[in-house]
């Protein structure tokens, strides 16, 4: 019976000592707690479910998205791939032709050189 009388006050005080045990939800990018009233040194930033206030410590600068440093895509030291990508071509234009195309062109050119048939007139 004495053990029960000791355990009962411990179970009543435990939620007040450990905030996570009392079931307070995290809010404002997990930097605040949903409470009925904010404690000293906390500021209300938003409202939670069940008409509770999202309380965050007022002495810190809190943002919705934590500041992160940009991640470089690759290191800036030049390598073999950089050399390959910066090669400039000297040939701007070239034409590919086949033997068949050359034969067709030569036949088309000769078409105007054909002679007219001889026409004989009788008197």
From Swiss-Prot:
Host defense peptide that exhibits antimicrobial activity against both Gram-negative bacteria, such as E.coli and S.typhimurium, and Gram-positive bacteria, such as S.aureus and B.subtilis. Inhibits cell adhesion of E.coli on intestinal epithelial enterocytes. Causes rapid permeabilization of both the outer and inner membrane of E.coli, leading to morphological alterations on the bacterial surface. Binds to bacterial lipopolysaccharides (LPS) with high affinity, and may thereby be involved in immunoregulation through LPS neutralization. GO terms for biological process: antimicrobial humoral immune response mediated by antimicrobial peptide; cell-matrix adhesion; defense response to bacterium; defense response to Gram-negative bacterium; defense response to Gram-positive bacterium; innate immune response; killing of cells of another organism; negative regulation of cell adhesion. Residues 1-19 form the signal peptide. Disulfide bonds join 27-54, 34-48, 38-55. The gene is DEFB118. Its main location: secreted. GO terms for cellular component: extracellular region. Pfam families: Defensin_beta_2 (PF13841). One of its GO terms (molecular function) is lipopolysaccharide binding. This is Defensin beta 118. Residues 112-123 have a biased composition (Polar residues). Keywords: Antibiotic, Antimicrobial, Cleavage on pair of basic residues, Defensin, Disulfide bond, Secreted, Signal. It is found in: Secreted. Residues 100-123 are annotated as: Disordered. It comes from the Eukaryota. The lineage of its organism: Eukaryota, Metazoa, Chordata, Craniata, Vertebrata.
């Amino acid at each position: 019976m004495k053990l029960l009388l000791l355990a009962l006050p411990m179970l009543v005080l435990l939620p007040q000592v450990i905030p996570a045990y009392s079931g307070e939800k995290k809010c404002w990018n997990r930097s605040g707690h949903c409470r009925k009233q904010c404690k000293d040194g906390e500021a209300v930033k938003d409202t939670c479910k069940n008409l509770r206030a999202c309380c965050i410590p007022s002495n810190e600068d809190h943002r919705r998205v934590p500041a992160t440093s940009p991640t470089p895509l690759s290191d800036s030291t030049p390598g073999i791939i950089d050399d390959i990508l910066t090669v400039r071509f000297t040939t701007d234009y070239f034409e590919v032709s086949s033997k068949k195309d050359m034969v067709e062109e030569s036949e088309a050119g000769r078409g105007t050189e054909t002679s007219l048939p001889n026409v004989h007139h009788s008197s």
